[in-house]
């Protein structure tokens, strides 16, 4: 019986991890509220001389039509040099640009940051010859989100 339970746990755990990986998002937990995390991220974007496009507060928009939504914000930002390089590899990646970072509160009240995994975009758009740019974008996204989420 213990062997069956252990086997099921392993199988279900593997299935769960696959489902998480397949959605193409990287998600980390923040030590701050959604709003504070998004504020910190926006400041980091500006400090790095990236292009800040806009910030969308979906919860505020929901409240405007008398609906409720846990805190949910999106920041659109980018770097025209990196974005252009990616689009030159696969023009269809433009549908996923500029970069987006999602700041949200889960059902347990924990603040999270999610963003598109650049390597998932590579696969999704059949990108060739952009590994160096993808590596830089991936590293930058990881650093920005970690800094915004840290105490």
Language-model regions, residue ranges each:
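N-terminal signal peptide c-region/cleavage motif recognized by signal peptidases
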Residues: 14-18
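Extracytoplasmic
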Residues: 53, 70-72, 96, 108, ...
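Beta-strand/loop substructures that line and gate deep hydrophobic ligand-binding cavities in soluble
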Residues: 100-127
């Amino acid at each position: 019986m213990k062997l069956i339970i252990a086997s099921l746990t392993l199988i279900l755990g593997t299935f769960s991890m696959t489902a998480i990986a397949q959605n193409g998002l990287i998600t980390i937990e923040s030590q701050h509220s959604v709003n504070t995390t998004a504020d910190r991220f926006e400041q980091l974007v500006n400090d790095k001389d990236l292009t800040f496009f806009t910030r969308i507060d979906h919860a505020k928009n929901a409240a405007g039509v008398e609906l409720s939504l846990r805190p949910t914000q999106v920041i659109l930002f980018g770097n025209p040099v990196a974005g252009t390089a990616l689009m030159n590899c696969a023009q269809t990646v433009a549908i996923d640009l500029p970069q987006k970072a999602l700041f949200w509160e889960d059902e347990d009240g924990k603040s999270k940051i999610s963003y598109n995994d650049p390597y998932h975009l590579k696969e999704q758009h059949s990108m060739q010859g952009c590994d160096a740019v993808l590596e830089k974008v991936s590293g930058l996204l990881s650093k920005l989100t970690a800094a915004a989420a840290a105490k």
